């Protein structure tokens, strides 16, 4: 997130501004907040009749991966402002057009397109240098791990590698049996991923200096890997194997639901609903988004 006294430009900030330019690298997941900083800035620009220019940048997950549940209206917040899938398959410029047209911002928007980019490119395919977008997104590949564990991390009951050298690449806790969890997750035969038993000690954050056991997530095929699907299976496996443990934290449930976009994931896991049934519930909305939004961008040659 961008931190400061306000989340949107004030009238004073925009005094004498002739054009407002957005040039920030995003990571392709709904709860990563730069896209809402962009939306708030677009709203402020619209109010002041200031042209808004987006210098488009690659979505590090590529331009075809759409996955996860849609955000429900009542869960709007700074970690999810609009009803889009958790992994949305659009660049920041494409999102700006979506926000402007579908959600009635109506600013004077211009998107400067990228050269040489195509939708099949993940970040490593672009040849660009990755500049960390925040301290816990040190590599372009981290953007693919973020939607695989980031929602779980909001619980604060499961460590996801933040505070260690592998942010978003781990699942750990003192009460996990590393071999057991790895065996369970690998038995689910999730596409493009392997889970390795892992033992580690975070340097800081919630589980600082605790000896944790769990799994390291190894993405074997970044084209086949489905991060949100994998995250739901991780939650379901933890609930199945360690049902006596406190997986959900009442003080963090509200934040978990905001990031997840509704109460559905949390309550379904709590009630023992299978991972596949949870995933099946969002398929119709996801496919509708792909047909209406993503295919429109593909047809326009973006």
Predicted regions, residues:
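Conserved functional hotspot residues or short segments at active or partner-binding sites
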Residues: 172-281
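Short acidic catalytic loops
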Residues: 19-27, 53-56
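Glycine-rich, charge-decorated loop segments at or immediately adjacent to ligand/cofactor-binding or catalytic sites
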Residues: 53-75
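Conserved anion/nucleotide-ligand pocket segment
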Residues: 75-149
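Glycine-rich oxoanion-binding loops at beta->alpha junctions
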Residues: 1-16, 29
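Glycine/threonine-rich flexible loop motifs
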Residues: 26-38
């Amino acid at each position: 997130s961008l931190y400061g006294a306000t989340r949107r430009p004030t009238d004073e900030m925009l005094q004498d501004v002739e054009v407002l330019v957005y040039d920030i690298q995003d990571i392709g997941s709904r709860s990563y907040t730069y896209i809402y900083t962009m939306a708030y800035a677009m709203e402020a620009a619209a109010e002041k009749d200031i042209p808004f220019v987006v210098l488009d940048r690659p979505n590090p997950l590529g331009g075809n991966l759409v996955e996860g549940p849609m955000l429900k209206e009542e869960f709007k917040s700074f970690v999810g402002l609009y009803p889009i899938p958790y992994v949305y398959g659009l660049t920041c410029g494409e999102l700006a057009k979506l926000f402007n047209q579908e959600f009635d911002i109506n600013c004077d928007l211009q998107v400067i397109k990228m050269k040489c980019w195509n939708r099949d490119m993940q970040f490593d395919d672009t040849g660009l240098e990755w500049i960390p977008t925040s301290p816990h997104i040190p590599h372009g590949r981290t953007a693919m791990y973020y939607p695989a564990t980031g929602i779980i991390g909001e619980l604060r009951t499961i460590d996801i590698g933040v505070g260690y050298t592998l942010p978003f690449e781990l699942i750990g806790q003192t009460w996990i049996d590393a071999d057991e969890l790895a065996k369970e997750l690998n038995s689910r035969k999730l596409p493009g991923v392997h889970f390795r038993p892992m033992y580690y000690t975070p340097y800081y954050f919630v589980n600082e200096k605790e000896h944790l056991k769990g799994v390291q997530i190894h993405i074997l095929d970044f084209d086949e890997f489905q991060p949100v699907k994998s995250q739901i299976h991780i939650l379901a496996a933890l609930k199945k194997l360690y049902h006596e443990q406190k997986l959900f934290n009442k003080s963090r449930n509200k934040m978990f639901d905001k990031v997840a976009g509704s109460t559905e994931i949390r309550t379904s896991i709590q009630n023992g609903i299978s991972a596949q049934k949870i995933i099946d519930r969002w398929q119709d909305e996801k496919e509708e988004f792909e047909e209406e939004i993503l295919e429109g961008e593909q047809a326009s040659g973006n």
